[in-house]
Swiss-Prot record:
<dbReference type="InterPro" id="IPR044145">
    <property type="entry name" value="IF2_II"/>
</dbReference>
<dbReference type="Pfam" id="PF11987">
    <property type="entry name" value="IF-2"/>
</dbReference>
<feature type="region of interest" description="G5">
    <location>
        <begin position="330"/>
        <end position="332"/>
    </location>
</feature>
<keyword id="KW-0547">Nucleotide-binding</keyword>
<dbReference type="Pfam" id="PF22042">
    <property type="entry name" value="EF-G_D2"/>
</dbReference>
<protein>
    <recommendedName>
        <fullName>Translation initiation factor IF-2</fullName>
    </recommendedName>
</protein>
<dbReference type="InterPro" id="IPR027417">
    <property type="entry name" value="P-loop_NTPase"/>
</dbReference>
<comment type="similarity">
    <text>Belongs to the TRAFAC class translation factor GTPase superfamily. Classic translation factor GTPase family. IF-2 subfamily.</text>
</comment>
<feature type="binding site">
    <location>
        <begin position="293"/>
        <end position="296"/>
    </location>
    <ligand>
        <name>GTP</name>
    </ligand>
</feature>
<feature type="region of interest" description="G4">
    <location>
        <begin position="293"/>
        <end position="296"/>
    </location>
</feature>
<dbReference type="GO" id="GO:0005829">
    <property type="term" value="C:cytosol"/>
</dbReference>
<dbReference type="InterPro" id="IPR015760">
    <property type="entry name" value="TIF_IF2"/>
</dbReference>
<feature type="region of interest" description="G1">
    <location>
        <begin position="193"/>
        <end position="200"/>
    </location>
</feature>
<dbReference type="InterPro" id="IPR009000">
    <property type="entry name" value="Transl_B-barrel_sf"/>
</dbReference>
<comment type="function">
    <text>One of the essential components for the initiation of protein synthesis. Protects formylmethionyl-tRNA from spontaneous hydrolysis and promotes its binding to the 30S ribosomal subunits. Also involved in the hydrolysis of GTP during the formation of the 70S ribosomal complex.</text>
</comment>
<dbReference type="InterPro" id="IPR053905">
    <property type="entry name" value="EF-G-like_DII"/>
</dbReference>
<feature type="domain" description="tr-type G">
    <location>
        <begin position="184"/>
        <end position="352"/>
    </location>
</feature>
Length: 692
């Protein structure tokens, strides 16, 4: 038997890699990681040792069973004693809920008859009524009189503004911290990297689809999720767009993922979006596996790429003494892709990726959109629980009943468990594309939670509207800053968010862009009416305008522009912004000359006899006069003559006569600098870093 890596030996022994590493440590065999080698002699000894242990295992099973039964009896007894103690201690500090602030319930809680409390307070000159609602101050006063200690679980209703979804999340936090009921689930993997480094090609090879061929402009423009099976185990892949414009979408992908595969082209190295993708993974505290792609290319340089990983993002490969798994691959030819998948499963095993298979459902939303024949849908990855057709679900203030579940292969399924990517059909409205989806036990519960969330959002919106009004008034007081109003419609919520982010980068001091409305779906007559009222341009991304909207836009003179490639939309918008600016006047030096002689003419003034040294002078140009290096005059030319003839232009090395407008204090030796003012289209300095 040859030497083996730790994870390879664990596979042969049918053991968990982590357990084997613990066993090796107890045996005094030092290994740094799952990738460490074990020599041949040690491998043989371990194989022999574990085969002997298997023979003894059957004899030990009964003894272990007896021990477990004894432990369970002791645990149950302890729980019974603890519960008894809790009941006895209840007289200490009495915990009160908000509904206990009615006098009758309060009296019952503290063990003092309501009538006695009313009588005692009457004797003190204070009147209380049966069932009266108490405030916190009065409740504490009553408790103090009878020397009773109380504590409140909640604050007063008017101060309480808790989002009900926080309580739902708290349930999952408690379950995870307790560790009970958790079981292994498939890893969710995100492939990230620079544009054209091969993300879609890799996923295409793994899943054997033609996604890469369908994308326009070479950019993946929507987030998708797919599940594959490798060596009997499942892996869920999220495909996130690589172009910088979709930073926000990619960041959401990182939040939903367990492992990141950072793909780097061997012929291109670490690029800006590679660094950006790495930062998303790092900030999300997600383990990273590096796939060095395109090793089949003649100019591929794997070692140089590894060096860039170290120098630019401080990822040190395992073979160089670091802890980053690096796998050279060719996504196009499939070379070493199986090894990459094995490494994903290995890292998943080491990370102990788990979920709650029982109880309520919690899912991460990857994308939402309007789907023909289905209405509002949400693509999600289930994190906890099992979602069934017929379940009630909520996402923010939107609720629904699951009418259908569609998996990544387009098949209708009855249920979806942890780590499964699935499309949920049945929402009443389009849910938020970067929210969570939860299951609830009933329709009434769904309505209760969503109505509370809607109420909280309305309060927040009213507060923000007031702030916006103040900002608008302030802007009206300011000077000539131009504004461009836009209406933005796109095919998916993710595209709307990403394009809003890209447009925000184009804001400048000269022009403000107002996206007065953005949404998902076709351009409608309502959009045109809004554009008419606000003098806006309508931009559509991968959507069309319906016939009614087109006719109305033509009649109202509203411009509708539609695009299927992001770059074109942004470039056209830049051109439109620059077209709104007033042309900029720039100064262009045309020539220089020296006054050789001064002619004083009655009723005319002083005429300069000028020797042109370089360039030219024009009759409608502007001149600066310098004396001993100091600027004495700057103004227009009144007349330009050459041999007594009025001319429009004189070039060096010719001589000419120049009369300056409203200035006669000229001397021999004065130097003249001639320039003209040209109007050029102004260019905006777009803030490319804004919103990153």
């Amino acid at each position: 038997m040859a030497r083996l890596r730790v994870y390879e030996l664990a596979r042969q022994l049918e053991m968990d890699t982590r357990d084997l590493m613990k066993e090796l440590k107890e045996l005094g065999i030092e290994v740094k990681s799952h990738m460490s080698y074990i020599d041949e002699e040690t491998v043989n000894l371990l194989l022999e040792m574990y085969s002997e242990e298997d023979e003894l295992e059957d004899e030990l099973i009964y003894e272990e069973y007896e021990e477990e039964v004894e432990k369970e009896i002791k645990r149950k007894s302890k729980e019974f004693v603890e519960k008894s103690e809790v009941v006895k201690k209840k007289k200490g500090v009495i915990k009160l809920e908000e509904e206990d602030l009615k006098l009758d319930k309060f009296a019952q809680k503290i063990g003092i008859p309501q009538n006695r409390i009313i009588q005692d307070f009457f004797m003190k000159g204070e009147i209380l009524k049966p069932g009266q609602t108490l405030n916190l101050q009065l409740a504490k006063k009553i408790a103090k009189i009878y020397d009773i200690k109380i504590s409140f679980e909640v604050e007063e209703r008017e101060e309480k503004k808790v989002n009900p979804l926080e309580e739902v999340e708290r349930y999952f936090e408690e379950k995870y911290s307790e560790g009970e009921g958790l079981s292994e689930r498939p890893p969710v993997v995100t492939v990230m990297g620079h544009v054209d480094h091969g993300k879609t090609t890799l996923l295409d090879y793994i899943r054997n689809t033609r996604v890469a061929e369908r994308e326009e402009g070479g950019i993946t423009q929507s987030i998708g999720a797919y599940q594959v099976e490798v060596n009997g185990k499942k892996i869920t892949f999220i495909d996130t767009p690589g172009h910088e414009i979709f930073t926000e979408m990619r960041a959401r992908g990182a939040q939903a993922t367990d492992i990141v595969v950072l793909i780097v082209a061997a012929d291109d190295g670490v690029m800006p979006q590679t660094v950006e993708a790495f930062n998303h993974a790092k900030s999300a505290n997600v383990p990273i596996i590096v796939a060095i792609n395109k090793i089949d290319k003649p100019n591929a340089n794997v070692e140089k790429t590894k060096q860039e990983l170290v120098n630019k993002i401080n990822l040190i490969p395992e073979e160089w003494g670091g802890d980053t798994i690096v796998v050279p691959i060719s996504a196009k030819k499939g070379q070493n892709v199986d090894t990459l998948l094995e490494m994903i499963l290995l890292v998943a095993e080491m990370q102990e990726i788990k979920g709650l298979p029982d109880g309520p459902v919690r899912a991460v939303t990857i994308e939402t959109r309007m789907e023909r024949g289905f209405g509002p849908v949400a693509n999600v990855i289930i994190k906890d629980g099992v979602l069934h057709v017929g379940d009630y679900v909520i996402s923010g203030k939107v609720m629904g009943k699951v009418k259908a579940l569609v998996n990544d292969r387009g098949e209708r399924i009855r249920e979806a468990g942890p780590s499964m990517p699935v499309m949920i059909v049945g929402f009443e409205e389009l849910p938020d594309s970067h929210g969570m989806v939860y299951s609830v036990e009933s329709l009434s519960k769904a309505r209760e939670i969503t109505s509370k969330i809607a109420e909280l959002e309305q309060k927040e919106l009213r507060r923000k509207r007031h702030m916006k009004l103040e900002e608008i008034l302030k802007m009206m007081e300011q000077s000539d800053r131009k504004e461009l109003n836009l209406i933005l419609k796109a095919d998916t919520n993710g595209s709307v968010l990403a394009l809003n982010g890209a447009i925000n980068k184009l804001q400048s001091d000269e022009i403000k862009i107002n996206v007065i409305h953005s949404g998902v779906g076709a351009i409608t007559s309502s959009d045109v009416m809004l554009a008419t009222a606000s003098d806006a341009i309508i931009f559509g991304f991968r959507v069309k305008a319906d016939s009614k909207a087109r006719k109305m836009a033509e009649a109202e003179g509203i411009q509708i522009k539609t695009y299927s490639i992001v770059y074109k939309l942004i470039e056209d918008l830049k051109a439109a912004l620059e077209g709104m600016l007033e042309p900029e006047e720039i100064e262009e030096i045309s020539g220089r000359g020296e006054i050789r002689k001064v002619f004083k003419i009655k009723k005319v003034g002083s005429i300069a006899g000028v020797q042109m040294k370089e360039g030219y002078v024009e009759s409608d140009g502007i001149v600066r006069l310098y004396r001993e290096g100091k600027l004495i005059f700057e103004g227009k030319i009144e007349s330009l003559k050459h041999y007594q003839q009025d001319v429009k232009k004189v070039e060096a090395p010719q001589e000419c006569g120049i009369k300056l407008e409203a200035f006669d204090d000229i001397k021999e030796g004065d130097e003249l600098e001639f320039y003209i003012l040209k109007k050029v289209s102004k260019k905006l300095n777009f803030d490319e870093e804004k919103g990153e």
